[in-house]
Amino acid sequence: MDLIIQNLEKEYMKKDIPEIWPGDTVRVHYRIVEGDKERIQVYEGVVIAKKHGGIRETITVRKVVQGVGVERIFPLHSPLVEKIEVVRRGRVRRAKLYYLRERKGKSAKIAEREENEG
């Protein structure tokens, strides 16, 4: 039964998603439908969490707008997500970066990861 579900899900999974890790700064191009109009909204921020797996995989992206932290959860394999670009690789030692919610300024900065680092 599990194999049947995996094969079904594989059909709907996107293949062009880059490797994303918590701490990375990403730019998500998200399709928004407003009435009969459709537009692409670009949302750039730091990935603070990556959850689930397979077709249900989601990332939580956080950015600060006018001093207020804004978080948005994006399903990676949703047809509404046009594309995801990795702007910068971050070096962190945690899988969930929820502690960034309490931090601001320099203490909320994430060091850049070297390409040869794992």
From Swiss-Prot:
Keywords (alphabetical) are: Ribonucleoprotein, Ribosomal protein
Instruction: Tell me a GO cellular component.
Output: cytosolic large ribosomal subunit
What InterPro entries does the record tag this protein with? Ribosomal_bL19, Ribosomal_bL19_CS, Ribosomal_bL19_sf, Translation_prot_SH3-like_sf
Q: Which PROSITE patterns match?
A: RIBOSOMAL_L19
Protein's GO biological process: translation
Q: What terms describe the molecular function in GO for this protein?
A: structural constituent of ribosome
Q: Which SUPFAM superfamilies match?
A: Translation proteins SH3-like domain
What's the domain of life for this entry? Bacteria
TM stretches of this protein: none
Q: Which NCBIfam families match?
A: rplS_bact (TIGR01024)
- Sum up the protein's function in the record's words: This protein is located at the 30S-50S ribosomal subunit interface and may play a role in the structure and function of the aminoacyl-tRNA binding site.
Hey, which family's this protein in? Belongs to the bacterial ribosomal protein bL19 family.
Q: What is this protein called?
A: Large ribosomal subunit protein bL19
Which species is the source of this protein?
Dictyoglomus turgidum (strain DSM 6724 / Z-1310)
